[in-house]
């Protein structure tokens, strides 16, 4: 993955492999709960602003990921496997805005920002330079497709469809 977090995750997986301890690697995509701040922003402003362009995210709920972890811990046949886990649908920020509008009961629009506009907005909000760089790098990764993969592995492991975006956002509203 080109996502800014990928090198740390890769290094962790390499250390686990080098340890010789039997393991299963769960590569969780984005958590739907990561969008709690977007709900608050949208409630206040009617806008979800980001520099992800039309990038897509196959997020899933913490419960979906936790259920998958329980399955691989409790069922035989998973040792040595690495699973790419994502939600059943890869959505864009227009879809996110519509889902947030549904859960808060008011209009919400997605405002696509350039990376520079996003950095300026984050700076105006008081974020430090390192955090701004991290957030805009995450959005660049999403814009580039780093979180768009959805192959059904998570749903197969948990034996049910993953939690739809709007249902994952509802408890956060």
Label each residue range with its predicted role.
Residues 24, 41, 58, 89, ...:
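Residues that recognize and position ribonucleotide moieties
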């Amino acid at each position: 993955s080109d996502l800014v977090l990928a090198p740390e995750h890769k290094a962790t997986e390499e250390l686990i492999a080098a340890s010789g301890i039997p393991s299963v690697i769960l590569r969780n995509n984005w958590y739907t709960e990561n969008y709690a701040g977007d709900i608050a922003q949208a409630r206040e402003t009617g806008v979800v602003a980001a520099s992800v362009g039309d990038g897509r995210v196959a997020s899933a709920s913490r419960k979906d990921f936790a259920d998958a972890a329980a399955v691989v811990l409790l069922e035989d046949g998973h040792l040595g496997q690495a699973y790419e886990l994502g939600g059943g649908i890869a959505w864009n920020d227009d879809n996110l805005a519509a889902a947030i509008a549904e859960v808060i009961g008011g209009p919400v629009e997605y405002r696509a920002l350039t990376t520079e506009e996003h950095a300026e907005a984050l700076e105006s909000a008081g974020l430090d330079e390192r955090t701004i760089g991290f957030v805009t790098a995450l959005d660049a990764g999403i814009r580039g497709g780093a979180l768009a993969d959805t192959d059904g592995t998570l749903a197969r492991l948990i034996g049910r469809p993953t939690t739809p975006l709007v249902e994952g956002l509802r408890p956060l509203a």
